[in-house]
Amino acid sequence: NEGGDGMKKAVYVPHYAPAEAKAKDLCKGAQSLLERYEIITKYVSDKIAYDYIRAITIPKRGGLPDVERWWKLHMGICLDIASLTVGMLRAVSIPASLIIGWADGHYHAWVEARIGGKKYLYDHDDPQKKVKLYKKERMY
């Protein structure tokens, strides 16, 4: 046990006030949760780059997200990006989880949101939705 489920959730999806404030500001005037989801994921897709240096220096499994670095540099790896995206979605009342597992055989992290009983997957690294098989290992 890594400090209980609450501790793990706080480590993998920490509250980060600047990102949460940005999410609320972006979503002012949004009429639905789906519209908020689309605004946040578009913002992340448009503003955040993949950090190839961090990708080769972080442990392949067991690394932790660095949301402050992500926010300041506008870049991160899948874990950083998914973690902060979940935090931004939750800040605007969208139920969302950070998923860690496998995507087409590669260790990966992505976002799962639930809106109106429907599941939405967001994967910054796969904007064309080419990944055919996601397999959950952990969820936060």
Predicted regions and their residues:
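Short, aromatic- and glycine-rich surface loops/edge beta-strands on solvent-exposed regions
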Residues: 1
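Secondary-structure boundary elements
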Residues: 6-76, 84
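Hydrophobic/aromatic-rich core segments of domains that either
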Residues: 81-140
